[in-house]
């Protein structure tokens, strides 16, 4: 039986590829997709969700737009990474259907209410929508199996010295998620920087030769350009968000540990830092399954296999 999931995302090149992977996987039943502000402004990320689902011929999946800004600060976007549209590079179709006439929180709450079984939330952007859901619908917490997020890091940041982008955009929301009591699975930079896509992998995807694999290759062409900056020391481009979906499909290719994680919401130098109690110093019970490593070759193979689904 397929695992029911909802995806809250801010497309974004890697969010788009996470959607491609999820919708090529019969092991998963995507019940809804909601858009968060983050990589681009909320109207652009919502449009990008609709464009991707149009490309993938999935107008049956309900879509809704979310919060326009983080809980307690102005919105920060990553247009230097993802371009003016949020999905610069390929030529994507215009949306062929409209979003639901409700908010992301209302859509997620409706799906949880109607589901006969618990639902996994996958959040690949800032955690604003998820935090608002948790705050406004405590009666639905028991219907959430787990929250799988892309965000944070045990070590270095990628937007501030100590903070990863998604957590930095809305640290208060992320802290609410980690301390919610709902199991969290964290794909942070520790693992996503090991999930690099190399130029040869992009050509492999391109050679699959269907319209979706071609667009994924073109998305990665654009995404690769930003990551060529010498400061990163990368051979390729880290494919952050698809790690969440890949973990649901093949957890055995990931190395994980169980630890307590909190988010620094106020630090002068560390706002947005995910504080990982690696040595169990706080006495707090672990609240997070933390991904630390991935079999990169198996990860790329999984992507290639699922891209062939769109033939």
UniProtKB/Swiss-Prot annotation:
Keywords, sorted A to Z: Glycosidase, Hydrolase
One GO term describing the cellular component: cytosol
Pfam family, one: IU_nuc_hydro
SUPFAM superfamilies with a match to the protein in the record: Nucleoside hydrolase
Catalytic residue positions: 240
GO BP term, example: nucleobase-containing small molecule interconversion
Organism domain of life: Bacteria
EC assignment: 3.2.-.-
Function: Hydrolyzes cytidine or uridine to ribose and cytosine or uracil, respectively.
Family statement: Belongs to the IUNH family. RihA subfamily.
HAMAP family: Pyrim_hydro_RihA
Protein name, entry field: Pyrimidine-specific ribonucleoside hydrolase RihA
Organism in which the protein naturally occurs: Klebsiella pneumoniae subsp. pneumoniae (strain ATCC 700721 / MGH 78578)
Protein's gene: rihA
């Amino acid at each position: 039986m397929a695992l029911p999931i909802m995806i809250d995302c801010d497309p974004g090149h890697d969010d788009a590829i996470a959607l491609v992977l999820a919708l090529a996987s019969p092991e998963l039943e995507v019940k809804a997709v909601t858009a968060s502000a983050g990589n681009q402004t909320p109207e652009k990320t919502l449009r990008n969700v609709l464009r991707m689902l149009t490309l993938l011929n999935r107008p049956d999946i309900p879509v809704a737009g979310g919060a326009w800004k983080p809980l307690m600060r102005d919105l920060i976007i990553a247009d230097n990474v993802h371009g003016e549209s949020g999905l610069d590079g390929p030529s994507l179709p215009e949306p062929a259907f409209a979003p639901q006439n409700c908010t992301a929180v209302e859509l997620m709450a409706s799906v949880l209410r109607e589901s006969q079984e618990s639902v996994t939330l996958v959040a690949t952007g800032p955690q604003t929508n998820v935090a608002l859901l948790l705050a406004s619908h405590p009666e639905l917490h028991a219907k959430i199996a787990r929250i799988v997020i892309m965000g944070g890091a045990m070590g270095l940041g990628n937007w501030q010295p100590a903070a990863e982008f998604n957590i930095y955009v809305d640290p208060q929301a992320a802290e609410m998620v980690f301390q919610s009591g709902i199991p969290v699975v964290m794909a942070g930079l520790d693992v996503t920087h090991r999930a690099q896509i190399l130029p040869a992998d992009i050509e492999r995807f391109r050679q699959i030769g269907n319209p979706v694999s071609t667009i994924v290759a073109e998305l990665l062409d654009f995404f690769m350009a930003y990551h060529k900056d010498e400061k990163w020391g990368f051979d390729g481009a880290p494919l952050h968000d698809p790690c969440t979906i890949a973990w649901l499909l093949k957890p055995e290719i990931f190395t994980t540990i169980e630890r307590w994680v909190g988010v620094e919401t106020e630090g002068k130098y560390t706002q947005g830092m995910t504080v990982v109690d690696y040595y169990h110093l706080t006495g707090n019970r672990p609240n997070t399954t933390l991904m630390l490593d991935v079999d990169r070759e198996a990860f790329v193979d999984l992507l290639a296999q699922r891209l062939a689904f769109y033939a």
